[in-house]
Amino acid sequence: MKNINPTQTAAWQALQKHFDEMKDVTIADLFAKDGDRFSKFSATFDDQMLVDYSKNRITEETLAKLQDLAKECDLAGAIKSMFSGEKINRTENRAVLHVALRNRSNTPILVDGKDVMPEVNAVLEKMKTFSEAIISGEWKGYTGKAITDVVNIGIGGSDLGPYMVTEALRPYKNHLNMHFVSNVDGTHIAEVLKKVNPETTLFLVASKTFTTQETMTNAHSARDWFLKAAGDEKHVAKHFAALSTNAKAVGEFGIDTANMFEFWDWVGGRYSLWSAIGLSIVLSIGFDNFVELLSGAHAMDKHFSTTPAEKNLPVLLALIGIWYNNFFGAETEAILPYDQYMHRFAAYFQQGNMESNGKYVDRNGKVVDYQTGPIIWGEPGTNGQHAFYQLIHQGTKMVPCDFIAPAITHNPLSDHHQKLLSNFFAQTEALAFGKSREVVEQEYRDQGKDPATLDYVVPFKVFEGNRPTNSILLREITPFSLGALIALYEHKIFTQGVILNIFTFDQWGVELGKQLANRILPELKDDKEISSHDSSTNGLINRYKAWRG
C-alpha cells in the first residue's frame, strides 16, 4: 500500500475549501432544494439492505471530492492488496485475509504462494463434524449424558464477535445454552459456573497462543471446577475443546488435540468470528446457518472489491465518516440498532473500529497531524432515547449516528414493532430537521399559554436539527443479512485506515498495560509496602494491600 499523508493531497485541500462553503448549509436546505435527494443518496444491497445516507451534510460535489481523496490515496490498490494476500499488516509482517474465511466461491487466495482455501475448508469441515456431534447428542460427557451448555472462554475478538452474533441470531438458536466468559475478574466465571452442570457442559477455550492471561486464568478455574466433580483428568477431553494453534499447550491442559481447531496468523482477533473462533456460533445456530453468515459477508466482500467507489457502500460510509471527523471535528459516532437482539453490535464495533484505527502514528512512523479513528458507542433503541439522545439532539457536540433496524421482526407481538420503527423513523427526521422557534411558539399559542411563559420556555423547546444520520434498513435480521452488515462495517473501517494512512490491523496499544500488569502482579503477592512506581501507583497499591487484609 502507498504511504500518503491525506492532508497533503490536492483532494484534501479542495475538501477544505468545500467545507468552508458547506459548514453553514443545513440538511433542511439540501432537501428543500432537491425533491429527489433520497433516491440520489441511498442504495440497496442484494435486496436485503437499504442504506440511506441522504440525511447528511453532503452534496454530490462533497462525495465527488471525497472520492477524489480515495483515488489519490490509492484505495483501489489497497483493496486489491488485501484480497490478494499481500502482507499489508507490515508491523507484524502478516497478510490480512478474514475475507478468505468466508470465500464461498472458493477461488484460490494465496499467501506466500500457497492457496489458503484447502486449509480453511478443512477447518470448516472439522467444525461441522464436531458441532453436529454435540448438537445431536451423539457426543456424551463423562457420565454418558449429552451436552446441554457451552461456555466460550476468550477475550477481545475471541469473545466480542461470537457473543454479539449468537445474541443477534438468537431466533435461530437450538437447544444448547450459550455462555461467554471473558473478564479475568473471578466474578465472571463464578457466576457462569453457578448456572451449569459439569456432567453436561462443554468449554471452548479460545486463545491462539494458549497463553492469554485472562483466558487461561478462566480456563484453569473452569478445569479445577470440573475436576472437583469429575475426578479423573482423562474426562477433561470430553468437556473441553480448544480454538488455538499451540498443540503442545493444548495437550498439556488435557484437551485432545483432535478437538483443537486452528486458525492462522493472517486472521486478526477482531476479524476472527469467521474462523474457528466462531465455533460457539456454529454450536448455537448450527453449521448451515453459520455458512449463511459467511455467505452474507462474502456477498459484501464481492460488492466491496468489485463495485465502483461512487456506488460502494463501505466506501461511501467511510468517506462520510472522514468528512465529519476531520472537517466538522466530530469526535464520536453512535451506532444505534433498533433491534434488541443486536444489543451487542455497538460494543463489537467499538473494538472493531477503535482497536483498528485508534492510532496516532502513520504508516511511515510519523505522528499524524489530522484525526484518525473516532470514538464508537451506542445502545439499542428505544433505550438510548431515554438515556443520551438529549445530548445528540440539543447538546453542543456533533454526533453522527447510524440507525439500524429490520423491517420484519422475529417477534411480531401486537404493534410493538410498528412502535419501534415509528421511533426509528422519527428520530432521524427530528435530528435532521429539528423544530423551529416559530413552530414552538405556535404550539404554545394554540395551548393558550400567556406571552410571559411563552417567551421564557420557547428557547428550551427549540431543536436546531442539522444532526447527521445514516439509516440502514434490513429486510430481516438473518444469518445472511447479519454477515453482510458486519462485513459492511469491517470494510468501512479498512477504507478509513487506508485513507488516513495508518495500519488498521495491528494493536500495539494493548501491550503496555499488559507488560506493566505482569510487572505489578508479583508485587501484590505479599504485604510489603511498594515504592518502586510513581507516587499515585504506589499509593493505590499500598491502599489495596491495607484494605484487603
Curated annotation (Swiss-Prot):
Cited InterPro entries: G6P_Isomerase, G6P_Isomerase_C, Phosphoglucose_isomerase_CS, SIS_dom_sf, SIS_PGI_1, SIS_PGI_2
Annotated CDD domains: SIS_PGI_1, SIS_PGI_2
Metabolic or biological pathway, per its Swiss-Prot or TrEMBL entry: Carbohydrate biosynthesis; gluconeogenesis; Carbohydrate degradation; glycolysis; D-glyceraldehyde 3-phosphate and glycerone phosphate from D-glucose: step 2/4
Residues modified to N6-acetyllysine: 80, 228, 234
Catalysed reactions listed for this entry: alpha-D-glucose 6-phosphate = beta-D-fructose 6-phosphate
Annotated keywords: Acetylation, Cytoplasm, Gluconeogenesis, Glycolysis, Isomerase
Keyword field contains Cytoplasm: yes
One Gene Ontology cellular component: cytosol
Subcellular locations according to the entry: Cytoplasm
Enzyme class: isomerase
GO MF term set: carbohydrate derivative binding; glucose-6-phosphate isomerase activity; monosaccharide binding
Single biological process term from Gene Ontology: glucose 6-phosphate metabolic process
Active-site positions on this chain: 355, 386, 514
EC number(s) stated in the UniProt entry for this protein: 5.3.1.9
Family: Belongs to the GPI family.
NCBIfam families per record: PRK00179.1 (NF001211)
Xref: PANTHER family: GLUCOSE-6-PHOSPHATE ISOMERASE
Role summary: Catalyzes the reversible isomerization of glucose-6-phosphate to fructose-6-phosphate.
This protein's name: Glucose-6-phosphate isomerase
